[in-house]
Amino acid sequence: MTGLLEGKRILVTGIITDSSIAFHIAKVAQEAGAELVLTGFDRLKLVKRIADRLPKPAPLLELDVQNEEHLSTLADRITAEIGEGNKIDGVVHSIGFMPQSGMGINPFFDAPYEDVSKGIHISAYSYASLAKAVLPIMNPGGGIVGMDFDPTRAMPAYNWMTVAKSALESVNRFVAREAGKVGVRSNLVAAGPIRTLAMSAIVGGALGDEAGQQMQLLEEGWDQRAPLGWNMKDPTPVAKTVCALLSDWLPATTGTVIYADGGASTQLL
């Protein structure tokens, strides 16, 4: 993918550890020639240490998508890093959260609305608020890409996060309509299960042994169903799909979901 993103400036959100999908997207984007600006939430010193493992250094900005000041100042803070008069060409939204009450073995009906609403705010509404914050400094022809997970089925242990992903898909269609007015595309990538820190914790029993077993069965079944197979320890195919959407090679694709899951979502068994 050398040169695919040459000369492009990309904002990447959501790096937490070097197992984060966002980290691998950032790595592949840099290898493809992109200049990056990164955002982190909360433990910025830790995120900075992780970001230093990327092929090239990149500025790191603080971003809590529930903080209106962070959002309202984001464009100016990005401009301060890339230079006055310059704009960005792409945005990666790799942000998701659902309180423990809304996932795992906890009964679906028992999740408090306050927890569910927080999860939907961070996982879905923030896609629109991030787009609104950065569109004024995006070049026409650019793209916004968000991370999805197939929400068309009731996934074990995923519970209200599945609902949040359904909301994200709807939000994406409206973001595409608004962003299209300034020539910017908006799409989601629905990834197969990846062994991120959060997924590893669930499989390890962080949300209960039953939830861990369910997620492990989901992972194993994914590889069996996928016509191309699926390696949950290799996020590179997902990262490449995101970078393809950030490139100039899909100029008429917007408002949709691209699957990077080995084809498992198309198969019953």
UniProtKB/Swiss-Prot annotation:
Substrate binds at Y158. Its EC number is 1.3.1.9. The record marks F149 as: May act as an intermediate that passes the hydride ion from NADH to the substrate. Disulfide bonds: none annotated. It catalyses: a 2,3-saturated acyl-[ACP] + NAD(+) = a (2E)-enoyl-[ACP] + NADH + H(+); a 2,3-saturated acyl-CoA + NAD(+) = a (2E)-enoyl-CoA + NADH + H(+); (2E)-octenoyl-CoA + NADH + H(+) = octanoyl-CoA + NAD(+); (2E)-dodecenoyl-CoA + NADH + H(+) = dodecanoyl-CoA + NAD(+). It is found in: Secreted, Cell wall. Is phosphorylated in vivo. Phosphorylation on Thr-266 decreases enzymatic activity. InhA activity is controlled via phosphorylation: phosphorylation on Thr-266 decreases InhA activity and likely negatively regulates biosynthesis of mycolic acids and growth of the bacterium. InhA activity is likely inhibited by activated isoniazid, hexadecynoyl-CoA and octadecynoyl-CoA, which also block the biosynthesis of mycolic acids. The antitubercular pro-drug isoniazid (INH) is oxidatively activated by the catalase-peroxidase KatG and then covalently binds NAD to form an adduct that inhibits the activity of InhA. Enoyl-ACP reductase of the type II fatty acid syntase (FAS-II) system, which is involved in the biosynthesis of mycolic acids, a major component of mycobacterial cell walls. Catalyzes the NADH-dependent reduction of the double bond of 2-trans-enoyl-[acyl-carrier protein], an essential step in the fatty acid elongation cycle of the FAS-II pathway. Shows preference for long-chain fatty acyl thioester substrates (>C16), and can also use 2-trans-enoyl-CoAs as alternative substrates. Homodimer. Homotetramer. NCBIfam families: InhA (NF040631), PRK07889.1 (NF005908). This is Enoyl-[acyl-carrier-protein] reductase [NADH]. It comes from Mycolicibacterium smegmatis (strain ATCC 700084 / mc(2)155). The gene is inhA.
